[in-house]
Regions:
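Alpha-helical scaffold segments that mediate packing/assembly in large oligomeric complexes
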Residues: 95-168, 288-299
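Helix N-cap / beta->alpha transition motif
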Residues: 84-89, 175, 181-186, 241-243, ...
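Short acidic, glycine/tyrosine-flanked loop/strand segments centered on an H-E-D-like triad
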Residues: 69-99
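Extended, solvent-exposed, turn-rich assembly/linker loops in the middle of proteins
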Residues: 134-208
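Active-site-surrounding "flap" and adjacent substrate/cofactor-binding loops of secreted or lumenal enzymes
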Residues: 49-51, 57-71
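N-terminal, well-ordered alpha-helical segments
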Residues: 40-42, 81-83, 107, 111, ...
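Glycine-rich, flexible loop segments associated with nucleotide phosphate handling
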Residues: 98-109, 170-178, 234-239
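Sequence/fold signature of self-assembling virion shell proteins
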Residues: 2-28, 35-38, 43-52, 72-76, ...
Length: 299
């Protein structure tokens, strides 16, 4: 009975807190899928767009259906996990005064697995930088060397690329929904820019990774931004896009968690796995840049 509670609560925690733990995944519309096997293709329904048209008077035409796009995502990746609860921890959960306290205790012991799984999915999203429809480098394939003087220019450049749109009323820029996901080195230079707006004190809920605003972008920092190291130098590929509309992901809702007790061990262990897949259906909603950074102090 206790094992059922622990397994059930762990999977509930996963579904409830997984999205909150994503950073790069904030660019994505991710859906939980049940009963999937590795290699399956699933449909992910992306948020819809609204059709606009010229109006010169008279009766309005019949309304068009809001266009939703469905994209195929292959569930081709998996992540296994295992954790152990000491017998005293199980007793603490078992003897909790009510169901709510039991759930909170299980959450406390299982959140690290949720965080690690979300980080793994974020890394998969980071690899999609190669699909970006808006891209800039330093010329001839070289990286842009970040500095106090050009970091805002890069954000403004990407803003202009997104605002251009398709000249049919469809802009790739939506005020208040634009996210730039950068490595910590990028944030170092942002801190030197005068009009960079840090996170407001007293903010009701700070999203994981959110550090401030500049040039219309909500800026989020992630260690999972793609980095490629060669000859002692690391090149990074920050991502730019529209919150929840740029990337697509499918994640198994079943974690296949099983309790077991090894021989000569009094503690109970739990093992399981989750499956996932990612895609970039809207290249025009995704931007990236090739950058490198050398941080120095007092120069």
């Amino acid at each position: 009975m206790l094992d059922q509670l622990i397994v059930g609560t762990f999977e509930q925690c996963f579904k409830k807190y997984f999205y909150d733990e994503l950073v790069i995944g904030k660019l994505a519309h991710s859906e939980f899928k049940s009963g999937v096997q590795k290699g399956d293709e699933v449909d992910v329904i992306m948020p819809g767009t609204v059709a606009m048209f010229d109006y010169d008077g008279g009766d309005l035409p019949d309304a068009e259906v809001v266009t939703n796009s469905s994209t195929k995502v292959r569930i081709d990746k998996g992540r296994g996990f295992h954790f152990e609860l000491k017998e005293i921890e199980r007793k603490t959960i078992e003897n909790a005064k009510d169901a709510g306290q039991k759930v909170n205790l299980v959450k406390e012991y299982s959140m690290d697995a949720v965080k690690q799984f979300a980080s793994t999915v974020d890394q998969a999203y980071a690899d999609l930088y190669t699909r970006a429809g808006h891209y800039v480098d330093g010329g001839e394939g070289k990286a842009i060397t970040l500095s106090e003087s050009n970091v805002k220019d890069l954000l403004a450049y990407m803003q202009a690329k997104f605002k251009r749109g398709d000249n049919k009323g469809h802009t790739n820029w939506i005020d208040g929904q634009m996210i730039a996901i950068v490595p910590p080195e990028f944030q170092f230079f942002l801190g030197k820019v005068e009009d960079y707006a840090y996170v407001e004190s007293g903010h009701k809920k700070i999203e994981k990774g959110f550090v401030g605003k500049l040039a219309g972008w909500d800026i989020m920092v992630s260690n999972n931004v793609k980095g490629v190291t060669a000859e002692g130098k690391t090149t990074y590929y920050p991502l730019f896009g529209i919150k929840g509309k740029t990337l697509a992901g499918g994640v198994s809702s079943d974690l296949n968690t099983t309790p077991y007790k090894p021989e000569k061990n009094f503690n109970t262990r739990y093992k399981g796995y989750g499956l996932y897949g990612v895609g970039a259906p809207r290249a025009d909603f995704l931007g990236s840049a090739k950058v490198e950074a050398t941080m120095t102090i007092g120069q």
